[in-house]
Structure formats: structure tokens, C-alpha cells
Amino acid sequence: TRQATLFPYTTLFRSPEVDNEIDETNAIKETEYVSAIDFAVLDSQNPDVVAWIQIPGTQINYPVVQGKDNDYYLHRDLNGQKSTAGTIFLDYADRADFSSLHNVLYGHHMKNGSMFKDISRYKDQGYFDQHSEIIVYTPEREIHLKALAAVCTSPDAIRRKTEFASGEEFASYIQQMTAGASTSAPIEGTIVRLY
């Protein structure tokens, strides 16, 4: 079976611990990151919640969980109840803090427009260009991503690769994964993470 795959990326990201601000005396003041998402409430509902994903202008605005495997949340909702739609989830092999070089998120393409249905719309270059900003909120930081390419693929293990021996291997992997993209954007800077 074929699926739509979107490859967003980051070129720079903030320190997970603090943001820096300049005060009136021009001294750097460290302030703690405060998430726009109440992760304490989400954690009390389900401790498997690791993030929240939002793509402005789309229906994608969901919590992200990570299970012990890639099967549990495929057909279970956030509360662990059976659900055709499942829950958006991070590959079990990725690091929960999104520090893997390639962070793989899964979600169903639901006919009612929910979950990752809007990913299939990225095949249109105009839609791709208008919805290229992707935000991942974690308890430690806010990650702003830019869409790199949309590819119609079959799910296979190569697309799940999360560890790389070198920067060259990672760059080669990016080229391989985005080859044949139906839509894409120019790369701005050096890619440090792929999602």
C-alpha cells in the first residue's frame, strides 16, 4: 500500500533548557521555556505523550505519543481505547525528546479529514508552499520545522532509519528519501534534523 510522506526539517533549534533574552542592561537573562501546551495535564491523562504537533491552516493539531512498539497506538486513542483513527505517534526507536537525526511520526489518513489526512494534500505545490510551517511542541522546547518534500511511498524500513554513522551518510539519506518528490522546497541552510 502507498502512503503520502512529508519530510519536514530543522536547520537550527533552541537549547532545550533555556531561551536567552537581553534585558535593559544588555545582560543576557536566562528564562525557562514555557510551553503553549499544558503537558502536565496531558501527562496525567497519558504518560506516553511526548509532544504536540500543529500545522497552521490544516486540521493537524494533535498530541503525539510514543509507545513501546509501533503497533499499540496504531488503533488506540489517547486514552488507550480501541479507535480506527488511532493516535499520532513517534516511532518507538526515536528518542522521546526529538533529538534523533530522523524523527518519524505516524498517523492515519482518515476520510473525515482528521489525523494526517491533510498530508495527502501536500502533493499540490501551492498547498505545500502555503502550509510549509510545522510546529512540534515538547515539554522542553518548541521546534519550528519547514516542509522539505512530499513523497508518495510504500512504508519500508529504510524510511525508519534514525541513526547515521556520519554527516555524509545523513546527507545521502536525505537525498535518497526525497528523490522523486511530487513537491518540494529549496533547502535553507544545513539540515540538522529530519522529521
Task: Identify the meaning behind each predicted range.
Residues 1, 5-12:
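Short, small-residue-biased leader/transition segments that mark boundaries at the very start
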Residues 10-195:
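Solvent-exposed, non-transmembrane regions of membrane-associated and secreted proteins
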